[in-house]
Amino acid sequence: MLKVEPIPAFQDNYIWAIHDGRNAAVVDPGEAAPVERFLKDKGLALGAIVITHHHGDHQGGVAELLSAYPTTHDGAPMPVIGPAGERIGGRTQAVREGDTVTLPAPALQFRVLDVPGHTAGHVAYAGDLPGVGPVVFCGDTLFATGCGRLFEGTPAQMLASLDKLASLPGETRVYCAHEYTRSNVRFARAVEPGNTALADWEARVESLREAGQPTVPSTIGLERQVNPFLRSREPTVREAVKAQGGSVAGDAEAFGALRGWKDNFR
């Protein structure tokens, strides 16, 4: 049986630890110190490092972790798994769409999805974890009620990436890398003020944050109901985009206008 736990980092990052009570894989360790504290507090050995994309707040802790944990519990070189299309320090396994990642300790398997948009080579890791169920670790592509900025990709690429993630089973838990949900919900409410599922989710988000709890993971099923970036083809979203002066001439244009609105939303 596995557990997935957040390791807070920086101001609003989540490094994800997947562990079996003995060994842990960490996803997107932007800094090392919080990971080292977590491992020590839980009595865990580091078994693998998994990276979704090249930004420093996702891989900045890799070198320090490799210095502290050069090998796994059985003496093998520490695996560092990351996207083939990006520069990842210390990477031992380059992955792309269709690849399978298999780890011995903790015992788990992921299939790799190419999800360009936020960065050109961004990947996500989807799997079915014993004791957890279906999951996707999606970095900065899909957020709870939002999506990542388009730093390197196009609206068409990001839309296709989000469509790919939205096609996962509804019960899939979405482990994104930032606690942006409150601000994302504010924007979503501006886009779809009549969305009752979103109103319910807003109340839940406020309750969680007031209690100091993460709003992540969400689920793919919930995101389909409340996330404007998964709903950019909905008439309500299209009308809101048009009211802001955005083009809805095509799917990519409408998505790009929606993303541009969010970029400037206050």
Curated annotation (Swiss-Prot):
Obligatory cofactor(s): Zn(2+)
Broad enzyme group: hydrolase
Pathway: Secondary metabolite metabolism; methylglyoxal degradation; (R)-lactate from methylglyoxal: step 2/2
EC number: 3.1.2.6
Cited SMART domains: Lactamase_B (SM00849)
Pfam families named among the record's database cross-references: HAGH_C (PF16123), Lactamase_B (PF00753)
Reactions mediated catalytically: an S-(2-hydroxyacyl)glutathione + H2O = a 2-hydroxy carboxylate + glutathione + H(+)
Residues reported to bind Zn(2+) 2: D57, H58, D140, H178
Molecular functions (GO terms): hydroxyacylglutathione hydrolase activity; metal ion binding
Cofactor note: Binds 2 Zn(2+) ions per subunit.
Alphabetically ordered keywords of this record: Hydrolase, Metal-binding, Zinc
Biological-process GO terms, alphabetical: methylglyoxal catabolic process to D-lactate via S-lactoyl-glutathione
Stored CDD domains: hydroxyacylglutathione_hydrolase_MBL-fold (cd07723)
Residues that hold Zn(2+) 1 according to the record: H53, H55, H118, D140
Known role: Thiolesterase that catalyzes the hydrolysis of S-D-lactoyl-glutathione to form glutathione and D-lactic acid.
Complex and partners: Monomer.
NCBIfam families tied to this protein: GSH_gloB
Family listed: Belongs to the metallo-beta-lactamase superfamily. Glyoxalase II family.
Name of the protein described by the UniProt record: Hydroxyacylglutathione hydrolase
Species annotation: Cupriavidus pinatubonensis (strain JMP 134 / LMG 1197) (Cupriavidus necator (strain JMP 134))
